[in-house]
């Protein structure tokens, strides 16, 4: 852990980001820049939303990016833990009416209207803390817990913002969040291995006869391909579960989530067609293709996801 005097320094640095010359003038501009610069597929799903919903989901997404970046960009685990602790305190302050970081200044005005609660934001931070505390998951149940925090809860909040009238839509959102996260894990196996991380359950590696050392060394084998095919089949099952759970009454409002399903499931199929060559490259869709997939859901519905 960093020495005590760094706690104040880190907090001051995080807060001062709102004052730096490179930071946009308003919280709304800050979160818009954060969302657009990430290059994420989520950005394309936001484009078709009405202004208030787009502002709310953009602010929430920017919050998720901020805390996730702590794990991805801070090399010292002790400093990263301190930053996440700062974020926990910042969330508490924000729900007490005193946000200081621009992402929460942008998000909090929307929280009452869309039912965004303190527990939602804390869960996202808890998921990032899990990333710092472990680099392996023994079984799928353990991985599910992680996915619940970093993706299921995100799906739940997103569904509330998009427009939810049926309780079952929460179940849909959690299943879809899990499907999206499993797709991310499949896509990023090689990148994660470079950072010493393996999200694929160890029990699955053992079942297919794949050594963790082979993944960390980014070595392909027929066993690895079979392991990844199994992971893809599991992800497809969760896409199917999610789509089956979405009530007809909420289907129109939940189009942004269905856009994400279309984009990510198309990516998953691309990875399958590439025979899971994910250890040495990051397979992705072009921005134009992502926009086209999002537009098709907006214009034609989600019958072929």
Each model region followed by its residue ranges:
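Catalytic cores of Mg2+-dependent Asp-rich isoprenoid enzymes
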Residues: 10, 14-182, 186, 190-305
């Amino acid at each position: 852990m960093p020495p005590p005097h760094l706690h104040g320094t880190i907090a001051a640095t995080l807060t001062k980001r709102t004052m730096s010359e490179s930071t946009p003038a308003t919280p709304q501009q800050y979160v818009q820049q954060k969302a657009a610069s990430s290059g994420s597929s989520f950005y394309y799903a936001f484009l078709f939303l009405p202004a208030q919903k787009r502002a709310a989901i953009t602010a929430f997404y920017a919050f998720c990016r901020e805390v996730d970046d702590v794990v991805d960009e801070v090399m010292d685990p002790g400093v990263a833990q301190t930053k996440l602790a700062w974020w926990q305190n910042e969330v508490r302050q924000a729900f007490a009416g005193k946000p200081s970081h621009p992402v929460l200044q942008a998000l909090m005005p929307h929280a009452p209207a869309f039912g965004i609660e303190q527990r939602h934001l804390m869960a996202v931070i808890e998921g990032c803390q899990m990333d710092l505390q472990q680099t392996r998951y023994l079984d799928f149940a353990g991985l599910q817990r992680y996915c619940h925090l970093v993706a299921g809860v995100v799906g739940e909040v997103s569904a509330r913002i998009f427009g939810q009238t049926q309780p079952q839509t929460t179940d849909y959102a959690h299943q879809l969040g899990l499907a999206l996260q499993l797709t991310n894990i499949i896509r990023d196996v090689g990148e994660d291995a470079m950072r010493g991380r393996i999200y694929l359950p160890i029990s699955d590696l053992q079942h297919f006869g794949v050594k963790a050392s082979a993944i960390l060394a980014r070595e392909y084998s027929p066993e690895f391909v079979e392991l990844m095919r199994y992971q893809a089949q599991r992800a497809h099952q969760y896409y199917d579960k999610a789509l089956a759970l979405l009530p007809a009454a909420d289907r129109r409002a939940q189009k942004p989530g269905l856009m994400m399903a279309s984009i990510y499931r198309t990516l998953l199929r691309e990875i399958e067609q590439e025979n899971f060559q994910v250890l040495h490259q990051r397979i992705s869709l072009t921005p134009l293709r992502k926009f086209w997939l999002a537009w098709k859901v907006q214009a034609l519905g989600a019958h072929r996801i």
